[in-house]
Amino acid sequence: MGFPFSLPFDLQGWVDEHRHELRPPVANRQIWQDSDMIVMVVGGGNRRTDYHDDPRPEFFHQIEGSMVLRIMEDEGHPPVDLEIRAGEVFLLPPGIRHSPQRADPDGIGLVVEYARPEG
């Protein structure tokens, strides 16, 4: 009998199996494709210049290395850099403009967010 959901699995094993895909230029891999949640593993070695915001919270878990979440608090003011280190988690509230910076080439992070509606 099959389950209507996936079974638990070893996340570190999954990362090790897909590590070669977590390099620039794309540097990310979505774990589940048919879900209302976007659960992706993101590799390092890249810097973004764009900012975006989400209408719902976004969860960050840094598995290996470190990353900087650049947060734009107020227009016209410099951004605030929030470092997230290996083993740390952070829940970004909705509506905050941010730009994930993954300069650490050995960094690996898990990002969970709600799927965005089309349009």
Positions of PLM-derived features:
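Short acidic-glycine-tyrosine-enriched beta hairpin
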Residues: 73-94
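Cyclic nucleotide-binding regulatory domains
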Residues: 71, 87, 100-102
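Short secondary-structure capping micro-motifs at structural edges
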Residues: 28, 46-48, 57, 79-80, ...
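Ligand-binding loop in jelly-roll beta-barrel domains
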Residues: 94-118
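Short, conserved beta-strand element in jelly-roll/cupin
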Residues: 42-44, 53-73, 109-115
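A short, N-terminal "cap"/entry segment at the start of jelly-roll beta-barrel domains
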Residues: 1-43, 48-50
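His/acidic/aromatic-lined binding-pocket segments of jelly-roll/cupin-type domains
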Residues: 39, 50-52, 57-62, 81-82, ...
